[in-house]
Every structure is written in C-alpha cells, then in structure tokens.
Amino acid sequence: LKFVVLICLVIMASTSAQQCGDETCGAGTCCAVFSQNHCRRLSQMYDLCSDHADASPSGNYLFFCPCEPGLHCDRNTWTCTEGSSRSE
C-alpha cells in the first residue's frame, strides 16, 4: 500500500505544472510547449534557452524559456550568457 501511495505522489508531482494554454504564467516563468503547454521558470546562466523573438503569436516558446533579465540567449550555443545580445 505504501508503494502505491508513493507512486501516486510521484505522478501527481510530475503533472502539477500549471497548464498555460488559456492561463497566464506567473512572474519569472514562461509558457513552454512540449507535448503540452507548461509554465516553466525562465532560463538561468548556462541553461538551454529560446530567444525572446522566437515566441509564437500566443506567447509560447518551444521547449525552453527565454533567459532571465540581465542574460541573453546565445544563438550559437542556445544557452544563457551575460553580455550584449548583439552580434559583433
């Protein structure tokens, strides 16, 4: 019985991400599209990321969120880095 309860808790935790198809994600998050839409935290330093310009018309991002403020998504490595987002 304890095993069944543990399995149920794991399943509930893995599916508890807020659906964002019709809802707005909170501060510090974005709506990332996998097989379903889920609110996810903004990407941090060295995390994989999407560029802000890559948002769909509905404001969703494919797979990864853009970087948190102060960072930009390097389109060569698709990771969040410090510095200017302009190409040099």
From Swiss-Prot:
Residues annotated with Pyrrolidone carboxylic acid modification: Q18
Tissues expressing this chain: Expressed by the venom gland.
GO CC, alphabetical: extracellular region
Keywords: Disulfide bond, Pyrrolidone carboxylic acid, Secreted, Signal
Descriptive protein name: U1-hexatoxin-Iw1b
Family: Belongs to the MIT-like AcTx family.
Localization of this protein: Secreted
Entry keyword annotation includes Coiled coil: no
Upper lineage: Eukaryota, Metazoa, Ecdysozoa, Arthropoda, Chelicerata
Signal peptide (from-to): 1-17
Pro-peptide region(s): 86-88
Any matching Pfam family: MIT_LIKE_ACTX
Chief location category: secreted
Disulfide bond residue pairs: C20-C31, C25-C39, C30-C65, C49-C73, C67-C80
